[in-house]
Amino acid sequence: SLKLILCQGLHKPPHTGGAIDWHQDDYYFRIDKMNAVVSCWIAFDQATVDSGCMWVIPGAHTQLWPHESLESPGYRMLGADESKATPLELSAGRFMFHHGATPHRTLANTTDNPRRALAIHYMDATAHTLDGNREAEPPENMPIVRGASAG
């Protein structure tokens, strides 16, 4: 059974900043169970290196890396080997799933076109959010999207 944690519309206008530094979704969501979060990233426009596609560090999802707070909203992950970073370019309408502990980032859009996407984050319905959860939403308010409620 799955609960919806967060659904985000992501928009990178042409020739703008909008880079999101390395992070792991598990760091934000603060779930009491390992391997409980999965995220789906859907490209509405062509997502290329130049337009700010998703980058991942393969194999680095086996641990939760330390993060530091940034002045702007968010965190930056520390310590992972960025030399293995891989861009995941997607055509419009394509999607990718990633584990909640997969380190990922997006860079600025330097093209003449927007780069829009939708990120949908799910968690195991038997898991619970911990105090300090980024969204601070009670689990009972998270809709069940597959299966039955854990109670």
Locations of regions flagged by a protein language model:
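A structural signal for short, well-ordered beta-strand segments
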Residues: 7-9, 40-42, 118-122
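A structure-centric signal for secondary-structure junctions around beta-strands
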Residues: 6, 37, 51, 114-117
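Short, solvent-exposed aromatic-acidic interface loops
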Residues: 10, 59-62, 140
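Non-heme Fe(II)/2-oxoglutarate
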Residues: 69-70, 95-97, 101-151
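Short, surface-exposed recognition loops or helix-turn segments adjacent to catalytic cores
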Residues: 5-12, 54-57
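Signature of the catalytic double-stranded beta-helix
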Residues: 1-8, 30-33
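Short acidic-glycine-tyrosine-enriched beta hairpin
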Residues: 84-97
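Catalytic core of non-heme Fe(II) oxygenases with the double-stranded beta-helix
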Residues: 16-87, 127-135
